[in-house]
Amino acid sequence: MNIATKLMASLVASVVLTACSGGGSSGSSSKPNSELTPKVDMSAPKAEQPKKEEVPQADNSKAEEPKEMAPQVDSPKAEEPKNMAPQMGNPKLNDPQVMAPKMDNPQKDAPKGEELSKDKSNAEILKELGVKDINSGIINNADVVLNLKIDEKDHITVVLDKGKINRNHLKVTNTISAQDIKTLKDSSGKLLGYYGYMQLNQVRQDENYSDEKVSLNEYYLLSMNDADKIRPTKSISYKGDMFYSYKDVGNQKLKASVEASYDDVTKKVSMKVFGENNDYWKLGEFGRTNLLENQVTGAKVGEDGTIINGTLYSKIDNFPLKLTPDANFSGGIFGKNGEVLAGSAISEKWQGVIGATATTKEDKK
């Protein structure tokens, strides 16, 4: 405390001396100034010592603050990469998930899949077509199981799964007495379908009653793949056959020649059928009245290749220039380029199936 009092007294004295020397010469005033300056300088460090002692205390608090901040800064930095890692990982994981369906899509392309499904053997196609009658569809007689068989030359035959069946006291014998099946193929050789007829005999013997039943059934067969039906984009001529029979004749198979043509301008198909015993038919649109032959001009072909409202008109006895509605005709045009015509005719008196193909190589292209 004495030192501080002395310092304060010396400071006051220096101030008084400076004030008293204010009116003197400039030279006298410079001396006390020069003398007082070191005194002030000497006192300054002494006075600053306690301040320096407080400084480290302030420094200690400041030093502690960054130590506290360091973990605070480190923690968000450590958390940020942790947060970013899954964020960066998610898009990487999502990318293959998005790409996966893109890679799968071409594999599941409908057109390609359909093309591959169409690349079947004729035997596989024939199995899908089945044995179909124009009246009843799939033949489903009791104790009869029928299959189709195709050989190396694409000849088709109907075969029985079991010719003989023994069940308790009942004995069944099935036989195919006659058949004639023709294949219908496009220009590439792919099987489109078949048409023909078959005669099936069945004998049923019941031992309990000593009873025997014999039945003879005739079937006109036609089975085509509707997916191959098409309307041609140009005019085409066809030739083929019709298998037919009259219901009152009794299992007599007849055969007729067929001439047909499709007109790309009118979108109509015309057809003439020349049968046995001077039989003759001409294709026209549905009607119930007699028409002159030149009025029977064919039937329309729909966009999908279906022959619409077809009717076969036949000759009228004693009226050579007129035709009368005789049978309903249903069918269509098939194949890669519409090179196959097929259909069936059903009447109260007769029935038949028709198959015809393009006459020239140009028509098949």
From Swiss-Prot:
A lipid is attached at C20 (N-palmitoyl cysteine). Keywords: Cell outer membrane, Lipoprotein, Membrane, Palmitate, Signal. It is a lipid-anchor. Residues 19-121 are annotated as: Disordered. It comes from the Bacteria. The keyword Lipid metabolism does not apply. Coiled coil: none annotated. The keyword Signal applies. GO terms for cellular component: cell outer membrane. A lipid is attached at C20 (S-diacylglycerol cysteine). Residues 48-68, 105-121 have a biased composition (Basic and acidic residues). PROSITE patterns: PROKAR_LIPOPROTEIN (PS51257). InterPro entries: OMP/PagP_b-brl. It is found in: Cell outer membrane. SUPFAM superfamilies: OMPA-like (SSF56925). Residues 1-19 form the signal peptide. This is Outer membrane lipoprotein A. It comes from Actinobacillus pleuropneumoniae (Haemophilus pleuropneumoniae).
